[in-house]
Amino acid sequence: NVVFAFWDGEEIGLLGSKYFVQTCPFIPQIKGYLNFDMIGRNNKPENPQHVVYFYTEAHPAFGQWLKDDIKRYGLRLDPNYRPWDKPVGGSDNGSFARKDIPIIWYHTDGHPDYHQPGDEADRINYDKVMNISRAAFLNVWNLANEKTF
């Protein structure tokens, strides 16, 4: 089974994701969690395919999956691979990582108009959003079909 869920209250203490992991009756069955933050921005104008790809270091297959899928499916992404095992930042993936649930987290770094009136839809790189979405679909496919964990 695949569960799609959306959280609220991230920036005031991860309220939604914390509540979910504290009350979810099937936490032991969760194989992984995908998180997306600001995936449509071009924060490196010289590299519009840039994306930061955090994943749980104890699961190196997560990094290899993306490398293989970029090559196999021609995804137009230039990932900065960042394996890690300690929750960082204030994003919802931390709620899951603290429960020892492996995570994959797509991010495109900060930008000058973060939380500002100028943060408008015309600044979104829709090609990047599409390629990250395709990669995420393949992540979910791999997670759902992975037998080793």
Spans of features found by a protein language model:
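His/Asp/Glu-rich mid-to-C-terminal helical/loop segments that flank catalytic regions of hydrolases
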Residues: 1-2, 110-149
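Metal-dependent peptidase/peptidase-like ectodomains
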Residues: 7-108
